[in-house]
Amino acid sequence: MDAATRRSMLRNALLLGLFALVGVGLVALVQQFTEARIAEAQREARGRALLELLPPGSYDNHPLDSQVPTFAPKLLGLDAPRPAYVARLHGQASAVILQASAPDGYSGAIQLLVGVTAQGRLLGVRVVAHKETPGLGDRIELAKSPWVHGFDGKSLGDPADAGWAVKKDGGTFDQFAGATVTPRAVVRAVHKALRYFDANRERLLAPEEAAGHE
């Protein structure tokens, strides 16, 4: 093999290596951009769902900016702490929106917002992210079914503990035909969120100055 051939082969190898590096870099950039877009879309969906849970006239602050840290995230089904959002009217907490998760969904974790009045009653529940089966488990979405409205007005005592289950398990809440796992997981997660609120009520409803110095 003469010198010219070796130089040509080396040049081609370098070019192939360069193209491979550029390709890997482009894939990484696209992936990073896609992940950022997904995260932003989830934040926007969370913000919309949060405001949907709060009745008009029930707050005069900016709940998205009024956050209280939460602790013991596993009690909310979370891997890491996420803040609670507090709605205030005339300086007093009127409601708390908890971020929770049902880790035992059929196709993975189901991300939830759980709205609770200062008196401990559910304003409502919204699903903000999930991977449940289209046409079956995805009926936990308000856009697909009114099922989630079944939580409205409920509390720890209404129904009693035994009622916090799907009807197939002897509880109060409907399940879906062919998809019991998904609603069962959501019911369990909402019940846990209410327990968390009850155990941490004083801190979650504290005046803004006190909450900010927790």
From Swiss-Prot:
Named cofactor requirement(s): FMN
UniProt keyword 4Fe-4S, yes or no: no
Record keywords, A-Z: Cell inner membrane, Cell membrane, Electron transport, Flavoprotein, FMN, Membrane, Phosphoprotein, Translocase, Transmembrane, Transmembrane helix, Transport
Protein origin, superkingdom: Bacteria
Family: Belongs to the RnfG family.
Protein role: Part of a membrane-bound complex that couples electron transfer with translocation of ions across the membrane.
Name of this chain's protein: Ion-translocating oxidoreductase complex subunit G
